[in-house]
Structures are given as C-alpha cells and as structure tokens.
C-alpha cells in the first residue's frame, strides 16, 4: 500500500512538473492570430459578406476576433491590424521586415508589373527610385518659394473661377476645379507644365483618373483568383483602357523631356530621373550594376512619375473635397477659421506658408479632416519578407498585413466621440498651439513606406483652403440638402458630388492678389 501511495505521489509530481514546463515553454511563444472561418479555395470570402465597405466591416469584426486577426483571401493569409500599437510595429519597429508589397493583377496592370514606388516590392530598385524622387521633392522643399508660387498661382486661378460663378449666381461642382488646381501643381513638379480650363488633354486625364480610382484596389475577384483573367471582366477591361490613355500622355511628356534635356538644368521630377539614369549609364563600368539593374529603364521612369502624379493628385484633391464638405456641414468651424484669418492675415494680402504658425485653428481643422475621413482608410497592404512576429502573434513569410487606418482614427478608447468633427481635439486648452492627443493618428503612414508627398500635400491643403476661406463663405444652394458624409470607397474614400455656392465675403477682394506673395 505504501509503495502505491509513493508511486501516486511521484506520478502527480511528474505531471505537475510537465505541466509547469509546458506553460513556461509556451507562455512566451507567439501564437497564430485569431482567424475568421475559411474554406478551401474560397478562403474567408463568405465571412466577409456585408453591406458595409471593408474598412467599416474590419472595424466591426474586432469585437468578435480582437484588434488584430487574420483571414484568408483565396489562398493568401491576411492579417488585419486595427490598433495603433501593432500598426506602429508593422510600420516602424519591424518596418524593413514588413516592407514588401503583394503582386495583384490590377496593380500589375497599373504599374507595368510593379515598376513604381507605391506598389513596387521592396528591393534595391525600389530604394533607388525612392531616393531619387525624395531628392527631387527636396529640391522644391517644404517652404520653398518656387513651390509656394506654383500653389498660389493655382489658388488664385481657383478663386477667379469661384468669383465668376458667384457673379452669375451659379453653384459649382468643385470636384473638377479642385482636381485641375492640384493637377497643375503636380504637373509643374513632374513636367514643368500646367493645364487651362477645358484643355482636351486635361479632360482625358480626368476620365482616366476616375476610371483607375473606380477599378484598382477594390479587392476584386481577379486579384484574389488571378486565373479569372481568362473570362471577360468589365472592370479589368476599363482599367486597361484607362491605363493606356495615361501611358500615352506620360509617353508624350517623356519624349518632350528627352528631346530638350540638359544636364545643366533640372526643371522638374522627370529631369531628375533622366539625370539619374544617364549618370548610372555613364558610370556603370565602375559600378556593380547597370542602369537596368537598379530599375532605371524607361518603364521605371514612366511608372515612377505616373505614381507620383496619380497619387499626388487624387489624394490631395479628395482631402480638399472632404474639408469643404465638413466646413459646409459645420459653418461655425468655417466662421472660426475666417475670424482667425481676419485677425492674423487680414484682407490686404493673401495667406502664405509663413502664416501657418499663426493659424492653429485652420491647421487643426486640416488634421481633423485627415483623421475623420482618412483618404485611404485601408493602407496599401504590406507583406512579411521573412518569418517574424506581430505582438504575441507569429507571422509567416509572405503574409499580407493590412492596416485599417479607419479603425485607428475612430478608436473610441483613443478619441472622444470619434465620429464627431471637432478640430479642437488637436488644440491646446487655450487654443493657441497644436497638439497630438493620441498615437492612433497616422494619416500619411510611417516608416519606410511613409507617403513621400506628405510635406507637399500639407502645403497644398493649407494654401488652397486659406485662400478660399479668406475670400468666400461656402454653402449649398437653398434647394439642395447637405452633402452625404458617407463617401464612396475605392482607391480613396471620395465624397459624393454636389454643388457648392461660394459667397464673396464682405470687405474681401475676391479679385486677385498677386500670385507670388
């Protein structure tokens, strides 16, 4: 009996020790992220059926699966990140590990198989392109007088259009006017040229841009199941047609630049890329790689410029449209911005970049627009380049990671009443300076894949809005209801079209200040 008791105690001790060792060994071992149900071939598609757009659905799903969870898109493993801590780990702490990009059918059509910056995979080619484009942008630089003149020229032209409409009592759809203004800024940066109203080339550009916005990055089935390309596909056909028009316009600009290029003059971004290509070609005997090896083929030059051109126009234009939409919904905010402009700038000169520090409420309003309606609610997916981890979860090489910026910017634990438009959340208690109340704010991304045009976009948003609001009060015609705040999901989250009534402010010259302050 005694031996049986001793044996029982020994067995219990061994089992307890084994359990303890198992707990110690597994306590810190990363686990798989919680997963939505999935089926062979289909993946989690059946679990993603919803009347809501993806960014809203992904935010709702965290109530069941947690802030970070996984799903299957066909055969692809995808992790959805809804919290700023894991988002910053992807973008900053492990930025190089998560710097990859997925290859999809639609983005390959758009970028000639990834020969651009936004959708291009992480590589020596990508790093070289980014370095060149960054250098060209720095040539103009934040606060640069030349870039300020370009933006103010377009702001003046935009205000002229609003004045003409006001004089005849017309309400305008501002979408094409804002697009033309921003397009001309980017054209000056990329091509050293601009468009006038009604220009046939500009009208063609509007059509192809909208077609691309309507077809790319919609999680279309052909991106999940590439073999579906063999069947007729209206969206894919439209995308190819729009890209063909875009490429024809880019090729025209490219040939014009090559014909009158000079090593002694750098007029714009395309000149900077041509110079880098020629420099690499002339020095390739001493280098370990040729111009082709670092990606400086004509295709790469065109796609890099097209990338900056396309992204720079659509995103900034969309933010401006959202800003105007919210200012119409919140006339008290519009009035407060105008009062700030009256005090700090007056009516005898136009606003300029040096006024930014004196106009904190306008700057806070821009930040709030970027928060409440992030132009890209789902950041372009990242890809893990090696086996790694994310928080407590293991991540295998090749896993796609989607950061849901919408969730970050509407997190109830980080933002008080996140669905309420409130520029004051970005101001100090006395309203005299800007603050950042939460780390859950990444309107331009961060890290290796941060938006290259962040500084330029902020300059444009400030100057366009300050010029308009100094001169006009914006509203909708009495017969029209307030515009929807829901938006249309695509490459960017766009507001719906509506007409805007611009009323000249008493005492302000809706006429024209010099464009070169």
Swiss-Prot record:
Cellular location(s): Membrane
A cellular component term, taken from the record's GO annotations: membrane
Biological process, per Gene Ontology: hormone biosynthetic process; progesterone metabolic process; steroid biosynthetic process
Residue numbers binding heme: 451
InterPro entries the record matches: Cyt_P450, Cyt_P450_CS, Cyt_P450_E_grp-I, Cyt_P450_sf
Keywords: Heme, Iron, Lipid metabolism, Lyase, Membrane, Metal-binding, Monooxygenase, Oxidoreductase, Steroidogenesis
Enzyme Commission code: 1.14.14.19, 1.14.14.32
Cofactor(s) this protein cannot do without: heme
Pathway(s) this gene product operates in, as recorded in its UniProt entry: Lipid metabolism; steroid biosynthesis
Top-level class of the enzyme under EC nomenclature: oxidoreductase
Coiled-coil regions, chain positions: none
Gene Ontology molecular function: heme binding; iron ion binding; lyase activity; steroid 17-alpha-monooxygenase activity
UniProt cross-references to SUPFAM superfamilies, sorted A to Z: Cytochrome P450 (SSF48264)
Reactions catalysed, as given in the entry: a C21-steroid + reduced [NADPH--hemoprotein reductase] + O2 = a 17alpha-hydroxy-C21-steroid + oxidized [NADPH--hemoprotein reductase] + H2O + H(+); 17alpha-hydroxyprogesterone + reduced [NADPH--hemoprotein reductase] + O2 = androst-4-ene-3,17-dione + acetate + oxidized [NADPH--hemoprotein reductase] + H2O + 2 H(+); 17alpha-hydroxypregnenolone + reduced [NADPH--hemoprotein reductase] + O2 = 3beta-hydroxyandrost-5-en-17-one + acetate + oxidized [NADPH--hemoprotein reductase] + H2O + 2 H(+)
PANTHER family: CYTOCHROME P450, FAMILY 17, SUBFAMILY A, POLYPEPTIDE 1 (PTHR24289:SF14), STEROID 17-ALPHA-HYDROXYLASE/17,20 LYASE (PTHR24289)
Function: Conversion of pregnenolone and progesterone to their 17-alpha-hydroxylated products and subsequently to dehydroepiandrosterone (DHEA) and androstenedione. Catalyzes both the 17-alpha-hydroxylation and the 17,20-lyase reaction.
Family to which this protein belongs: Belongs to the cytochrome P450 family.
Official protein name in the record: Steroid 17-alpha-hydroxylase/17,20 lyase
Gene name per UniProt: cyp17a1
């Amino acid at each position: 009996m005694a031996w049986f008791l001793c044996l029982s105690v020994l067995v219990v001790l061994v089992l307890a020790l084994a359990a303890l060792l198992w707990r110690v060994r597994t306590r810190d071992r990363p686990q798989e992220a919680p997963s939505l149900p999935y089926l062979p071939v289909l993946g989690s598609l059946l679990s993603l059926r919803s009347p809501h757009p993806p960014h809203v659905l992904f935010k709702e799903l965290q109530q069941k699966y947690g802030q970070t969870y996984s799903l299957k898109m066909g055969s692809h493993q995808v992790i959805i990140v809804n919290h700023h801590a894991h988002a910053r780990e992807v973008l900053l702490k492990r930025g190089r590990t998560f710097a990859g990009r997925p290859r999809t059918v639609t983005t390959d059509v758009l970028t000639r198989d990834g020969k651009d910056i936004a959708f291009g995979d992480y590589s020596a080619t990508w790093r070289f392109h980014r370095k060149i484009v960054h250098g060209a942008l720095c040539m103009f630089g934040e606060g640069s007088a030349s870039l300020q003149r370009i933006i103010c020229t377009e702001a003046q032209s935009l205000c002229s259009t609003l004045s003409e409409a006001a004089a005849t009592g017309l309400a305008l759809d501002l979408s094409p006017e804002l697009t033309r203004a921003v397009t001309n800024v980017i054209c000056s940066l990329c091509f050293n040229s601009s468009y006038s109203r009604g220009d046939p080339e500009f009208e063609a550009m509007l059509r192809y841009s909208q077609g691309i916005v309507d077809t790319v990055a919609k999680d279309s089935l052909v991106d999940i199941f590439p073999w579906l390309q063999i069947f007729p596909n209206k969206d894919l056909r439209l995308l190819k047609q729009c890209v063909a028009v875009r490429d024809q316009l880019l090729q025209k600009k490219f040939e014009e630049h090559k014909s009158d290029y000079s090593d002694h003059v750098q007029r714009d971004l395309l000149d900077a890329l041509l110079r880098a290509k020629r420099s690499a070609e002339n020095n390739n005997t001493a280098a370990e790689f040729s111009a082709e090896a670092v990606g400086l083929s004509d295709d790469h030059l065109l796609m890099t410029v097209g990338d900056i051109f396309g992204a720079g126009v659509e995103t900034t234009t969309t933010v401006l449209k959202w800003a105007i939409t919210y200012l119409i919904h919140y006339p008290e905010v519009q009035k407060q911005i105008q009062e700030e402009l009256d005090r700090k700038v007056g009516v005898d000169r136009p606003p300029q970049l040096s006024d930014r520090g004196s106009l904190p409420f306008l700057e806070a309003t821009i930040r709030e627009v970027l928060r409440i309606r992030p132009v890209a609610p789902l950041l372009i997916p990242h890809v893990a380049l090696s086996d790694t981890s994310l928080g407590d979860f293991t991540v295998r090489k090749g896993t796609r990671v989607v950061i849901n910026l919408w969730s970050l910017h509407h997190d109830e634990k980080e933002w008080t009443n996140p669905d309420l438009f409130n520029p004051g959340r970005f101001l100090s208690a006395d309203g005299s300076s800007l603050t950042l109340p939460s780390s859950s704010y990444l309107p331009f991304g961060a890290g290796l894949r941060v938006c290259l045009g962040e500084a330029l976009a902020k300059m444009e948003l400030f100057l366009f809005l300050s010029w308009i609001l100094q001169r006009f009060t914006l509203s909708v015609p009495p017969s029209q209801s307030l515009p929807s705040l829901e938006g249309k999901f695509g490459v960017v989250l766009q507001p719906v079209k509506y007409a805007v009534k611009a009323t000249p402010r008493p005492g302000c010259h809706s006429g024209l200040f010099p464009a070169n302050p």
